[in-house]
């Protein structure tokens, strides 16, 4: 039971950190390469 409680307390923290890092990465990509729906360098 202790392992389940540890998992339930760690998983939300890790997903919050992961989605925060992913959102930051996407924001930085959009800052340096705006309008990425049209890739003009292909």
From Swiss-Prot:
UniProt xrefs under InterPro entries:
PSI_PsaJ (IPR002615), PSI_PsaJ_sf (IPR036062)
Q: Does the keyword rRNA-binding apply?
A: no
Q: Where in the cell is it found?
A: Plastid, Chloroplast thylakoid membrane
Its membrane topology: Single-pass membrane protein
Task: Decide whether keyword Ribonucleoprotein is in the record.
Answer: no
Q: Where are the transmembrane segments?
A: 7-27
What keywords would UniProt list here? Answer: Chloroplast, Membrane, Photosynthesis, Photosystem I, Plastid, Thylakoid, Transmembrane, Transmembrane helix
Q: Kindly report the protein's main subcellular placement as a broad class.
A: plastid
GO CC, alphabetical: chloroplast thylakoid membrane; photosystem I
Biological process GO terms, please? Answer: photosynthesis
Q: What does this protein do?
A: May help in the organization of the PsaE and PsaF subunits.
Family recorded in the similarity comment: Belongs to the PsaJ family.
- HAMAP family recorded for this chain? PSI_PsaJ
What is the name of the protein in this document? Photosystem I reaction center subunit IX
State the organism of origin: Amborella trichopoda
Species classification: Eukaryota, Viridiplantae, Streptophyta, Embryophyta, Tracheophyta
This chain is encoded by the gene named psaJ
């Amino acid at each position: 039971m202790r392992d389940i409680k540890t998992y339930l307390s760690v998983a939300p923290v890790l997903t919050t950190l992961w989605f925060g890092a992913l959102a930051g990465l996407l924001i930085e990509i959009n800052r340096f390469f705006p309008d990425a729906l049209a890739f003009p360098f292909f």
